[in-house]
Amino acid sequence: MRISLFGYGTTMKALAARVACTIYDDKFCEESRDEYGNALRPSAAFDPENSDLEIPSPGIMPTHPLILRAKHLCSEYDYFAPVMPPSVWISGTNGKTTTTEMTQLLFASEGALAGGNIGTPLAKLDSKAPLWILETSSFTLHYTHTAAPQLYVLLPIVDDHASWHGSFESYRNSKLSVIARMPSGTTAILPANLLPLVPKHCCELIAYENSAHLAKLFGIDTARVPFAEPFLQDALLALACAKILRNALPYELLASYHIGAHRQQKALDAQGRLWVNDSKATNMDATLKALPQYKDKKIHLIIGGDDKGANLLPLFEALAGYRLCLYTIGSNEERLCALAEKHAIPFVA
């Protein structure tokens, strides 16, 4: 079989180490070879008539010429579906990494492995492991059409990646698409507001309103869960996985989890001022969830970057209720300054 890989990042490099293939990437200017003897070619050199299977790097946009010319697209997940052990897929807008790490911790003693968008490509995961726990992006789900998990955990969805998907509706539909493929005997946990949009399905659906509702659904004692929002919801979903798959609630094991770097890391300086590093909060919803605990303080908020085409009006409507000053940076700085001015929010460009 003539296999073509699109892109040459972490995921495709791991795959190229396992299969004979030809790799196409925009950064290649001329043909060369990788360490395994695979051809490395410029994207323009791709000929669909000389390829039987095309596996795209998840981040390549659907409008890229390689995708438009491909005739046999297959996602990383679909390619490994025949050898994939029972799996938990974790998706949503925010909290995927933390929830995936927490869930893997709860199943680590039995040899469960974590991977996917969290950093370890499927090509590097042992297919003989009893369980894969995969952080799963909307990009991967967009290209996946056959693979399905034993348990799908969907965190809340808000406007994000519109520039990649073309619209929020397309982004949301990618997140929900896997449910249609899940067979009887599998389970999907999802936000209740998405229930009316779920496609025809055979799996069990468990819908939650918020953290309090999650705790009630699974009989979880939140007093034994040592995390505050937004990490509380992540922890409850990890415990829900343990409850569904093993009928257990390993509170003490969960309590040993340490929140990762750049996620609401707090430090006091010599003058007693609180600095919060929340640089993993890369979209509007994450910012909105981080601020309420500081409602009674004067906030200096550094904000900016690629907003991925999201509607930022709800963010600025909420920010207007805080005592704060914005410090705008990044590619959308002009847009942020205009919105701040419109909502009478002090800012420094």
Kindly label every feature range from the protein language model.
Residues 3-15, 20-33, 279-345:
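Active-site beta-alpha connecting loops in nucleotide-dependent enzymes
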Residues 19, 54, 90, 103, ...:
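Residue-level signal for inorganic ion chemistry
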Residues 112-128:
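Conserved substrate/cofactor phosphate-moiety recognition/catalytic segment
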Residues 2-3, 50-53, 111, 183-188, ...:
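Short active-site oxyanion
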Residues 224-324:
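Nucleotide phosphate-binding/pyrophosphate-handling subdomain across enzymes
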Residues 1-89, 265:
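Short, basic phosphate-binding NTP loop
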Residues 128-207, 211-226:
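Flexible active-site lid/hinge loop adjacent to a nucleotide/diphosphate
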Residues 76-117:
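Walker A (P-loop) phosphate-binding motif
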